[in-house]
């Protein structure tokens, strides 16, 4: 049997308010703080900040 994966899926939501999001994996034991990335949002055609939210 395969090992159980310790990573959790998190949703990175655009702060531009467009509703666009990305899904990433992170290990909660090694990365205790919330993720935030500056990535491209195609709805506003700019690089904006994406902040972590839990997947519902």
Curated annotation (Swiss-Prot):
Source species, domain of life: Bacteria
GO cellular component, one term: cytoplasm
A GO molecular-function annotation: structural constituent of ribosome
Keywords: Ribonucleoprotein, Ribosomal protein
Pfam entry (one): Ribosomal_L33
Annotated GO biological process: translation
Signal peptide: none
Listed InterPro entries: Ribosomal_bL33, Ribosomal_bL33_sf, Ribosomal_zn-bd
Family to which the UniProt record says this protein belongs: Belongs to the bacterial ribosomal protein bL33 family.
Protein name listed in UniProt: Large ribosomal subunit protein bL33
Organism taxonomic ancestry: Bacteria, Pseudomonadati, Pseudomonadota, Alphaproteobacteria, Rickettsiales
């Amino acid at each position: 049997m395969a090992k159980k994966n310790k990573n959790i899926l998190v949703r990175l939501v655009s702060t531009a308010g467009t509703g666009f999001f990305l899904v990433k994996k992170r290990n909660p034991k090694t990365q205790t703080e919330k993720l935030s990335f500056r990535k491209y949002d195609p709805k506003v055609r700019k690089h904006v900040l994406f902040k972590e939210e839990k997947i519902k």
